[in-house]
Amino acid sequence: MQLDQSNKAGTEPSEVVSRYLEAIYYMWYEKEPLRSARLADWLGVSRPTVAVGLRRMTRDGLVRMNGRKEIELTAKGMRTAESIVRRHRIMERWLTDGLGLDWVTADAEAARLEHAVSEVVEQRLYEVLGRPETCPHGNPIPGHSEASAKEVRLSTLGAGNRASITRVSEVAEREAPLLLAYLHKRDLTPGRRIRVLEADDVGKTLRVQVADREVTLSHETASKVWAVPVAKS
């Protein structure tokens, strides 16, 4: 099966536009409010800079502002963003599965390499890697798979609940790369089953068991981990 390359009708976007589209796509996917101030925080640039960038992207037919002053990707913008994200996630899989890099390093290197990779190399890597469905931390590769409709944030689970981790939010990956290393080191990775031992609504913490260890997470951290609840045995 060939990955969808239908967005390649025009020229490749610049690295700056790619960064904007990637960030907007991640926030949209995580159902975060898509406002320019939030985008500026994500990208680490000033609000006036984002305003200029969004005006250019609107002119180029990539984004639009809705009635709530939120950013929306147009059909063209979505196709372009999906292409960028797809290439990034395939590169991450190659860097982790093929070269043995850790999550954080792989993400940083993929961001550097993705702009220099052709469609031919991208497709070949995808095939060589066995047509992976997700990035190393579980986020679906656009055009090939989708997140489970049953998944919930770990922070919403109560004591006694069991779940299978599906993915770590891209928001965590981009805004708190050390969080990726923290979760990886504690085996809170896709495919792992966990049991909630304690949900402290006052202290805003979640104590979970994963394999033979116990891990305490803040609600903020737990909200960046997605999982599918499983029936109690």
Residue ranges and their predicted role:
Residues 1-44:
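Extreme N-terminal segment that seeds HTH/winged-HTH DNA-binding domains in transcriptional regulators
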Residues 48, 104:
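Key DNA-contact positions within bacterial/archaeal DNA-binding proteins
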Residues 58-66:
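A short, conserved structural fragment
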Residues 54-55:
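Short, hydrophobic-biased segments on the C-terminal half of alpha helices
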Residues 115-223:
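Mid-protein regulatory/catalytic core that forms ligand/cofactor-binding pockets
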Residues 69-88:
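Basic, amphipathic "hinge/linker" alpha-helix immediately C-terminal to the N-terminal HTH DNA-binding motif
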